[in-house]
From Swiss-Prot:
Subcellular location: Virion membrane; Host nucleus
Gene Ontology biological-process entries: viral budding from plasma membrane
Chain spans, region RNP-binding: 165-252
Subunit and partners: Homodimer and homomultimer. Interacts with NEP. Binds ribonucleocapsid by both interacting with genomic RNA and NP protein. May interact with HA and NA. Cannot bind NP without genomic RNA.
A GO CC term assigned to this protein in UniProt: virion membrane
This protein's encoding gene: M
Nuclear localization signal (motif): residue ranges: 101-105
One Pfam family per UniProt: Flu_M1_C
UniProt keyword terms in alphabetical order: Host nucleus, Membrane, RNA-binding, Viral matrix protein, Virion
Organism of origin: Influenza A virus (strain A/Mallard/New York/6750/1978 H2N2)
Function: Plays critical roles in virus replication, from virus entry and uncoating to assembly and budding of the virus particle. M1 binding to ribonucleocapsids (RNPs) in nucleus seems to inhibit viral transcription. Interaction of viral NEP with M1-RNP is thought to promote nuclear export of the complex, which is targeted to the virion assembly site at the apical plasma membrane in polarized epithelial cells. Interactions with NA and HA may bring M1, a non-raft-associated protein, into lipid rafts. Forms a continuous shell on the inner side of the lipid bilayer in virion, where it binds the RNP. Determines the virion's shape: spherical or filamentous. Clinical isolates of influenza are characterized by the presence of significant proportion of filamentous virions, whereas after multiple passage on eggs or cell culture, virions have only spherical morphology. Filamentous virions are thought to be important to infect neighboring cells, and spherical virions more suited to spread through aerosol between hosts organisms.
Protein name per Swiss-Prot or TrEMBL: Matrix protein 1
Main subcellular location of this protein, as a coarse class: virion
Coiled-coil stretches noted in the UniProt entry, renumbered to this chain: none
Miscellaneous information on this protein: Most abundant protein in virion. When expressed alone can form virus-like particles in transfected cells.
Length: 252
């Protein structure tokens, strides 16, 4: 796996699924391929994206700044600085300075990532802030190692939280989660269907599923009534793809 592929993988792992994630993935690909060279426009686009947490925006802004060539005098962006200041916690700053000194001695991506993984997310973000604000310099490889370590920690905590929700025994939470997943799957089906004639059927199935979820929420239904809803939708989607000549074995 190339360095940039690895960075893209880690960064995207902390972005919530949805159309915005696909957009961000495209931007990252363009930046890494050298196709997008307007850092100012890129940062303005990032700043106005909804849904993303300030820290995720800060990390993406840091990655864009590392990758896109820019004039030396280009202003640093406040939304990135605020996200990478470790909540103004002096402990985070102390640890970030110690980490920075260690990173100065590293020359490889993996070496930097290993060193960084033993620090808290707050210290890692603050260390990124030091580099972003030009208070310290490390090689791009080392900076990317720091980015990936931070993303790994965030993704770990997101995974723990997600797993807790998946294994919860509360039937109301499970019911709502199944309806949310069915609704987002239906939305994805509508986007993929496009405008071909064969798409009408897929669009109809997706539309019915969304109406069903809406009705279930409106009248209130038994928590077990949503079981299998998303899987039924995915089966329909795969059948539609087969007819279109697209073979995607796993969508779950």
């Amino acid at each position: 796996m190339s360095l940039l592929t690895e960075v893209e993988t880690y960064v995207l792992s902390i972005v919530p699924s949805g159309p915005l994630k696909a957009e961000i993935a495209q931007r990252l690909e363009d930046v890494f391929a050298g196709k997008n060279t307007d850092l100012e426009a890129l940062m303005e686009w990032l700043k106005t994206r909804p849904i993303l947490s300030p820290l995720t925006k800060g990390i993406l802004g840091f990655v864009f700044t590392l990758t896109v060539p820019s004039e030396r005098g280009l202003q640093r962006r406040r939304f990135v600085q605020n996200a990478l200041n470790g909540n103004g916690d002096s402990n985070n700053m102390d640890r970030a300075v110690k980490l920075y000194r260690k990173l100065k001695r590293e020359i490889t991506f993996h070496g930097a990532k290993e060193v960084a993984l033993s620090y808290s997310t707050g210290a890692l973000a603050t260390c990124m802030g030091l580099i972003y604000n030009r208070m310290g310099t490390v090689t791009t490889e080392v900076a990317f190692g720091l980015v990936c370590a931070t993303c790994e920690q965030i993704a770990d905590s997101q995974h723990r939280s997600h797993r807790q929700m998946v294994i919860t025994t509360n039937p109301l939470i499970r019911h709502e989660n199944r309806m949310v997943l069915a609704s987002t799957t239906a939305k994805a089906m509508e986007q993929m269907a496009g405008s071909s004639e064969q798409a009408a059927e897929a669009m109809e199935v997706a539309s019915q599923a969304r109406q069903m979820v809406q009705a279930m929420r409106t009248i209130g239904t038994h928590p077990s009534s949503s079981a299998g809803l998303k899987d039924d939708l995915l089966e329909n989607l795969q059948a539609y793809q087969k007819r279109m000549g697209v073979q995607m074995q796993r969508f779950k």
